[in-house]
């Protein structure tokens, strides 16, 4: 979506991390911003921080709760307007071996990371189809490209996002609809979500990640990997290397399989 001025933008997980930064960047582009977050204190703080920057609204929403998604979507349509840009950003991680996950850990991770983007999109996609206009940006992860110990359920949830998001893009293309989909796959970001992670590849700066995402939306990019070589390197390696060689390269040379050993 090349022109964001006066567009209505909904950002889930918008009261902290890259979600909050993206909200600020959207306001700086004269967009109107709606924040969904589970933390009311952070919502209030964000609204206070941004009140002089433009039209910004905040709603406390647990995106793992379908009723809350549906009720708050209705409030937006009734009281504010039709969403032009949806950024599915909310996410959680449980950094444990799979056998250490509780059932709640598994269910909650999949509900928030995988199910919520689809269910939230369902609430707003019909309006976009009716207007033949809109942009949906789904924040996945480079973890959705590669297997990794101590984040198996998180990885599964992000694989889901990538597969669904890009399939939706192709569906909309087949329907000749002017609705753009951007799938984002960043490496670890220094927002506090991945405290304790140790990596040979530099941890990403959240300000730079958020800016790259907004620019990708403005340019209608179909996919964004940060850093850019991650996607090409991963897919190329998976295509040409036997599994044991790929494991050696990824685990020992790149150190990826050990990044979560000190996760807190």
Regions picked out by a protein language model, each given a short descriptive name:
Residues 2-34:
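Canonical Rossmann dinucleotide-binding motif of NAD(H)/NADP(H)-dependent dehydrogenases/reductases
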Residues 31-45:
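Conserved glycine-rich Rossmann-like NAD(P)H-binding loop of the short-chain dehydrogenase/reductase
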Residues 40-41, 60-71, 103:
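The beta1-alpha1 cofactor-binding region of Rossmann-like NAD(H)/NADP(H)-dependent oxidoreductases
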Residues 97-98, 102-107:
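Substrate-binding pocket helix/loop in short-chain dehydrogenase/reductase
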Residues 121, 157:
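Active-site helix of classical SDR
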Residues 141:
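Residue(s) in the substrate-gating loop at a strand-loop-helix junction
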Residues 183, 198-235:
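C-terminal helical subdomain
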């Amino acid at each position: 979506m090349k022109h964001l001025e006066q567009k209505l933008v909904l950002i889930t997980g918008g009261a902290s991390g890259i979600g909050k930064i993206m909200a600020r960047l959207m306001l700086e582009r004269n967009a109107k911003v709606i924040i969904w977050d589970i933390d009311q204190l952070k919502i209030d703080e964000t609204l206070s921080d941004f009140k002089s920057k433009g039209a910004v609204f905040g709603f406390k929403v647990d995106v793992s709760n379908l009723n809350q998604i549906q009720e708050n979507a209705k409030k937006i349509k009734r009281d504010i307007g039709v969403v032009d840009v949806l950024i599915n950003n909310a996410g959680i991680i449980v950094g444990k071996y799979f056998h250490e996950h509780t059932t709640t850990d598994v269910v909650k991770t999949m509900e928030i990371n995988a199910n919520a983007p689809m269910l939230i999109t369902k609430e707003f996609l019909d309006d976009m189809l009716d207007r033949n206009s809109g942009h949906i940006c789904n924040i996945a992860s480079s973890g959705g490209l590669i297997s990794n110990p101590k984040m198996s359920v998180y990885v599964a949830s992000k694989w889901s996002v990538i597969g669904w998001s890009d399939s939706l893009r192709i569906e909309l293309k087949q329907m000749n609809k002017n609705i753009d989909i951007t799938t984002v796959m960043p490496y670890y970001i220094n927002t506090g979500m991945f405290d304790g992670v140790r990596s040979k590849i530099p941890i990403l700066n959240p300000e730079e990640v958020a800016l790259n995402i907004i620019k990708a939306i403005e340019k209608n990019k179909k996919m964004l990997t940060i850093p850019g070589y991650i996607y090409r390197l991963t897919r190329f390696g998976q295509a040409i290397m036997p599994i044991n060689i790929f494991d050696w390269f990824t685990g020992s040379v790149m150190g990826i399989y050990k990044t979560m050993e000190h996760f807190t």
